[in-house]
A protein has these predicted regions:
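Conserved AMP-binding/adenylate-forming core of the ANL superfamily
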Residues: 9, 17-71, 88-93, 190-196
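Conserved structural elements of the adenylate-forming
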Residues: 35-40, 172, 191-212, 217
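Structural core segment of the AMP-binding/adenylate-forming
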Residues: 48, 75-153
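Conserved AMP-binding/adenylation subdomain of ANL enzymes
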Residues: 199-216, 223-253
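Flexible, non-catalytic linker and terminal segments flanking ANL/adenylate-forming cores
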Residues: 1-2
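Conserved AMP-binding A3 loop
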Residues: 30-32, 167-168, 176-200
């Protein structure tokens, strides 16, 4: 059965205590930490009224929290809109508006140049650094950000365990990602990618690449591009690899 999300669920459960994501000169998340962060984002989405099929944008350098945001969005049933952080502010505003994103998760550098008033459809903006709320335009969202840890604690008094994971099953033709290209003329154009595309690329990688759980890899290409996303993050995460992110470019000695 073709389910991309099943790859993710299977990997998190099997590799629970293995290292998953590390930021350059930053913290390491194990697969269980990723699962727990996904769960807290699901609580925010649920309490703030995000529905299946709603769009959630992410814009920032590759990082552990970029990956967590991506995984939380698709396992919830929302559509992820990855945006290259190098895009100019008016292009980012345009993509957020054109995609009709309800939430934007943004890195510190990208956020400095953005203007929230230029993105009127957003219900909220959150920081990729620590998942704190930067802008909230509805009370439910404000409540969700303030109470996510308390609600998580009520739901999982003995913490979140592998058996708690029961992600939805995706359908091959269901929309997973809207990927905006670097527009050569005018603004970027959105490419609509179904789950079939994620599943087939990941399955292809399983067949031709030979990574094992616990192997270490560096994610260098931007995850807002499909190639970097598919072959330096999604496949490796599905295998149980330990992925390192260059959250900033190392300066040459």
């Amino acid at each position: 059965e073709q389910s991309f999300i099943a790859f993710l669920e299977d990997s998190i459960q099997k590799n629970w205590d293995l290292d998953a994501l590390t930021d350059y000169k930053g913290a390491t998340l194990q697969y269980k930490d990723v699962a727990r962060k996904i769960e807290k984002l699901h609580i925010i989405f649920e309490l703030s009224g995000i529905k299946k099929g709603d769009k959630i944008a992410v814009c920032g350098r590759n990082s552990s929290h970029w990956g967590v945001t991506f995984l939380a969005t698709i396992t919830y049933g929302a559509v992820i809109v990855p945006i290259l952080h190098e895009f100019k502010a008016d292009n980012i505003h345009n993509i957020v508006n054109h995609s009709e994103a309800k939430l934007l998760f943004v890195g510190d550098q990208a956020w400095e140049n953005l203007n929230e008033d230029a993105m009127p459809l957003l219900e909220g903006i959150a920081s990729l650094a620590d998942f704190s709320s930067l802008v909230s335009r509805n009370e439910k969202l404000t409540y969700a950000f303030e109470h996510r840890n308390a609600i998580y604690g009520q739901r999982y008094p003995k913490n979140f365990r592998p058996e708690h994971i029961c992600y939805r099953k995706d359908r091959p033709e269901e929309l997973a990602i809207i990927n905006y290209t670097s527009g050569t003329t005018g603004y970027s154009k959105g490419v609509m990618l179904p789950y079939r595309s994620l599943w087939s690329n990941t399955k292809f990688a399983f067949e031709v690449l030979d990574l094992q759980a616990g192997d270490k890899i560096v994610s260098m290409l931007p995850m807002a591009h499909m190639y970097g996303l598919a072959f330096e993050f999604l496949y490796e995460f599905s295998v149980g690899c330990h992925i390192y992110f260059l959250t900033r470019m190392p300066s040459p000695k």
